A protein has these predicted regions:
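A detector of single, family-specific signature residues
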Residues: 1-414
Length: 414
């Protein structure tokens, strides 16, 4: 097998150590290897970089192991060396022969022959935006957990507040919760704290607030409300920081928000996950495959065993699915037509994944060509398959016992 990179290295990265193996091709066709272990402190990683430069390494491969690879990547990226991040599932060694040294040697061997498929690593400024928005999403999940605990505490006290308000943290819900925390137990007085435009009647509100609230319930309610307020404040700080890092992304975000269902926040997340340089993905299909929005390849003996979606980029996929649900509810649009066309025969889950794939495909071409979104229209599928639709209707009429002769409107009027 041809050697593409005669001077390369493989790194087996751990929390405290990095096992590095240099592979140098010799004139006789053999290869010389040298293995060293370095610490993951800054001094240790700088020593690793100096050792690689001293041996003239041009390419370095490492596995994507949690977050441990990132400090190594950032320090080695400052040197004139090509870094390759490998998916651990793609470079597995022979079972039963796994050691740190053998892993590093195996990575170096695969890299030398060009057998390591590089994973997508965005530019540094995109990585900053990605870290901020992923943290924002995690804080949102934590807030949702505290809201659920809030509801559980209210149920324990037999307060059915969520039955009369749509949002516990809305104007009416928050006012009545604060009243409960402050020690008010009279349902009539608590009901008067609700906003006048609350749809539930005062009698229903009073009945929902008639419970058994004890001291520990008030303590837990106050605790969860304080946590929710703290998380809201943290999200606001992240939003301010994100806005300060959007200088080079404003044009791309403006384009993406023209897609039905894609909000400004969703556009920011999409840009943070895939970047704005679509040259990293040869085609839209490559981007869909990386995101996990296309069927997997699982064939044996000429039979397709599974067509389930791969896990892919979960941070991106969840956002795209949310956008797809929003887009499928936009009237008189292509995305809604696509969803309803597929839902009847494939089910809503597969249909919404197809809509998400359409949004990502449009995103790819918009960012690559700098064009705005052009909706194909709700009648796109009817226009595209007019003849097939006519034949299908004729077969249906024939099944019902009718013989029909078809003449086009233009020919009949001529």
């Amino acid at each position: 097998m041809d050697v593409l990179y005669p001077r390369c290295a493989g790194l087996d990265v751990h929390k405290a150590t990095v096992v590095a193996c240099i592979r140098l091709a010799l004139a006789n066709g053999q290869a010389a290897t040298e293995v060293r272990t370095f610490g993951t402190t800054t001094a240790g990683l700088l020593a690793l970089a100096a050792w690689l430069a001293e041996n003239g390494c041009t390419h370095v491969a490492m596995e994507a192991t949690g977050v441990y690879w990132k400090p190594v990547w950032h320090i080695l990226a400052d040197d004139e060396v090509t870094l390759v991040l490998a998916n651990a599932a793609h470079v597995k060694n022979v079972p039963g022969r796994k050691t740190d040294v053998s892993d590093a040697l195996w990575l170096a061997e695969l890299l030398a022959h060009g057998l390591v498929r590089p994973s997508f690593v965005p530019e540094p400024e995109t990585q900053v935006l990605r870290a901020l928005l992923r943290t924002r999403k995690q804080l949102g999940r934590e807030k949702a957990s505290h809201v659920q605990r809030l509801q559980k505490t209210l149920e324990d006290a037999n307060i059915k507040l969520d039955a009369v308000v749509t949002n516990l943290l809305g104007v009416s819900g928050r006012a009545m919760l604060e009243g409960l925390v402050e020690g008010e137990s009279d349902p009539g007085k608590l009901a008067k704290l609700a906003h006048p435009r609350l749809t539930a009647t005062p009698e229903r509100v009073q009945e929902a607030l008639r419970g058994r609230v004890t001291r520990h319930h008030r303590f837990l309610l106050r605790l969860h409300l304080d946590q929710i307020d703290a998380l809201d404040a943290a999200v606001a700080r992240i939003d301010a920081e994100v806005n300060g890092n959007l200088a080079s992304f404003h044009a791309a975000i403006g384009l993406l928000t023209s897609i039905p269902g894609v909000s400004k926040l969703a556009a920011q997340v999409i840009v943070a996950e895939i970047g704005i340089d679509m040259g990293r993905f040869p085609t839209a299909g490559h981007l869909l495959s990386w995101a996990g929005l296309c069927p997997r390849n699982d064939e044996s003996a000429g039979k397709r065993r599974s067509q389930r979606l791969r896990k892919g980029a979960s941070w991106l996929k969840t956002t795209l699915v949310q956008c797809a649900w929003a887009g499928s509810r936009k009237k008189a649009g292509y995305l809604q037509a696509q969803f309803h066309r597929l839902r009847g025969r494939r089910g809503p889950k597969k249909a919404i994944c197809a809509v998400a794939a359409s949004i990502l495909t449009a995103t790819y071409h918009m960012l690559k060509n700098g064009t705005s979104y052009q909706d194909l229209g709700p009648d796109h599928f009817k226009r595209r398959s007019k003849q097939a639709q006519a034949q299908r209707l004729l077969r249906r009429l024939a099944d019902l016992g009718y013989a029909v002769e078809v003449t086009s409107v233009a020919a009949a009027s001529a």
